[in-house]
Amino acid sequence: MRVLKYFRAPSSLRHRSSPMAQFLRRFSSSPMANEDEFQSPVEPSQQQSQDCVSESYLIGFVIANIVGLKYYSGRINGREMVGLVREPLNVYDNNAIRVLNTRSEQVGHIERTVAAVLAPMIDSHTIVVEGIVPNTRSNSNRYRIPCQIHVFAKLEASSTVKSTISRGGLVLISESDTSFGLSEAVVVKEQMGNGDKRSVDKIFKLVDENVKLMGKLVAAEPPREVIKSELFAHQKEGLGWLLHREKSGELPPFWEEKDGEFLNTLTNYRSDKRPDPLRGGVFADDMGLGKTLTLLSLIAFDRYGNASTSTPTEEPLDGEGDKIEKKGKKRGRGKSSESVTRKKLKTDDVVGMNVSQKTTLIVCPPSVISAWITQLEEHTVPGILKVYMYHGGERTDDVNELMKYDIVLTTYGTLAVEESWEDSPVKKMEWLRIILDEAHTIKNANAQQSRVVCKLKASRRWAVTGTPIQNGSFDLYSLMAFLRFEPFSIKSYWQSLIQRPLGQGNKKGLSRLQVLMATISLRRTKEKSLIGLPPKTVETCYVELSPEERQLYDHMEGEAKGVVQNLINNGSLMRNYSTVLSIILRLRQLCDDMSLCPPELRSFTTSTSVEDVTDKPELLQKLVAALQDGEDFDCPICISPPTNIIITRCAHIFCRACILQTLQRSKPLCPLCRGSLTQSDLYNAPPPPPDSSNTDGEDAKSSTKSSKVSALLSLLMASRQENPNTKSVVFSQFRKMLLLLETPLKAAGFTILRLDGAMTVKKRTQVIGEFGNPELTGPVVLLASLKASGTGINLTAASRVYLFDPWWNPAVEEQAMDRIHRIGQKQEVKMIRMIARNSIEERVLELQQKKKNLANEAFKRRQKKDEREVNVEDVVALMSL
DNA sequence: ACCGCCGGGTGCC
DNA sequence: ACCGCCGGGTGCC
């Protein structure tokens, strides 16, 4: 019987999997022997649409044994997900289903009786399966372990699937018995409409934010011996990122180290073997930002390199030292025949570092080859980087020949042709690095090219593309497979961890994808990049308070310190968070102008007791009123100026509709601080004073100019003297301050425009248009609230920016500057921060710096969920207690 | 004995 | 695998 089966195998395959070959593979522990165990990203039979995944729902699960454990090195601990991969070319059973662990190591097979039922349905895309191993402790059999196979199918196919499974003699444990399954299916269906497309736009959101907020990008200079062109700032930052990704020894995303063990938090895989760091990633800058030059700069380091730059220094390169070292003879011949002097080579040899392979393989579409050549000629010192064209006509079949070059250029087509050529030198070579240019061409639809590049051997892998996602997030799967980013490089894991949750509108899918891309990819868009912009300078202008202001400020600060110290002493600081914020707010307002803080609010001790305001709604209302005419803010849910303002017990502010909807939909928690929150914790804000601008105007007239206002005025006048046509923007976070500024500036002869959160969208665009209008000449000042100037607003008509008060968050300040310093800006830009001396404002600056540093040194710790914008420690620093 | 039964060899697909 | 299954050895009580 067994003999018969053996002969049924296609003869073309027999040599690959002859019993002897199997025997060798089984009992050889050499890593090389596992090379052909590597899973290609696309099984030949599964190339078509992946859409079925998103419309599927869980029909139920069957229990099946994973068998053959003793023949494979992959281990599992139980309570973890496994990858199920069809193996149609298995000689013993074309229904075979392989079981892989998080590390892509094979654990075993699904027992054949079960595979026989499931495999045909998998192949016809009728079902999708996911495997979970419940627990191995109770059932510690060395030869087989049970596994839950979850079966997903389209709603309309479910009855067929169910009967096929039971006819095959399997027991389907179905949740629809409890009527839960079906209702879930309906929900899933409804959410389908806006599933993938909209999410895709968000995938890279975190990438941007991460880069911006964490300031992770550290510029690096390419070696001058190789690269003769000066890089743009964003290219230097890109280079710094590439270097960082290649050298960093940090754990890949979703891995944690826990008492010497390494845990994959998504699959629950545990092992004491450290997962390899991901040396490489997705370089996804927009087209036209100079990715090619940046990559050439990276390659230049292989030759003249080293980190005499500002790049972070990390662990030594190459964890695969042993493996490659064994092939010493190859390296010797390849490199010593090169006569070019290499300073770095020596150093490396002394340190004992592995330098065996310095060749980078670049794969690109044929049309792009000439671009690489042009860039090489244009930007590199002639004769330094040696390039071999492995494309077209005559190509060497000698690996050693290829090793002589720094760069081997080839095309996807060439590789595809060589797929079946065993002795292809490109396939035999162990590259230092592989760069897939225009990597989106290997997306899932192009199975052959995907397969080929995935099998290439290299310790650093880069996917380079300006359009990482064309047909949906599934495109990214091909890149993961190429990067060998475990476990996502196994389709089954990708599907269950990312694709299915995403398709079902499950937040986990998107957030996982965001985290994933944030750590392994870099994407800057053309719009945000700063190519060829005139320089910008940032200055700080310190303002001395007048004696009168000083006296009031010192008095208030003294009082504030007392109040806060009291709260700290009796441990109720955080319970009185709202009080503290309003105290700090008052102090900050005083630095701008005393009239921001009306006389009745000039004492903290009278109106604010030690008890929290939350127990006194009338005080809360006062706070609301103060906030409302004071700080400019957005509803964090809809990210626009709030309508029908609601303030919560925990002092967060939302639109009425937004927060009510949120509370209804999810748990009764505040979306910002996650404190418990019910409808009774919501307080209405009093209706906004409709003619506030009129009364404010009167106020301004009656009061004299504050020190800061005077300082601003003289700065503006000095700039006007220099160039009467300079347009300026003044940002303040206090709406009232912007109103106060109008009168004195008008009086000094400036044309005033105003942009604030209370304006309609239409009005705002009108103001911005007017400000940018070249016919509006003379000294023009735009008084703007930053939050009102949403993203994408263009204020490049201005060349001076005044930040009238400092923001907590340095990124917000940066955003403000970006409105002016962006593409289209023709003049040099000067930014001036206005800071009151010896005041809380100086400490806000320090806080800014601290936050920046924190982000720099520990960017991997993304902001903790409960971290407030300002914490206890910050309060202590701000109050200089 | 074209059976039953014994006990060794063996073990994924 | 302290199992099941296979197939050879064996054969009254």
Swiss-Prot record:
State its Enzyme Commission number(s): 3.6.4.-
Protein family per UniProt: Belongs to the SNF2/RAD54 helicase family. RAD16 subfamily.
What biological-process GO terms show up in the record?
Answer: chromatin organization
Q: What class of enzyme is it?
A: hydrolase
Checking CDD domains in the record gives: DEXHc_HLTF1_SMARC3, RING-HC_HLTF, SF2_C_SNF
Protein name per its UniProtKB record: Putative SWI/SNF-related matrix-associated actin-dependent regulator of chromatin subfamily A member 3-like 1
Origin species: Arabidopsis thaliana (Mouse-ear cress)
SUPFAM superfamilies linked to this entry: P-loop containing nucleoside triphosphate hydrolases, RING/U-box
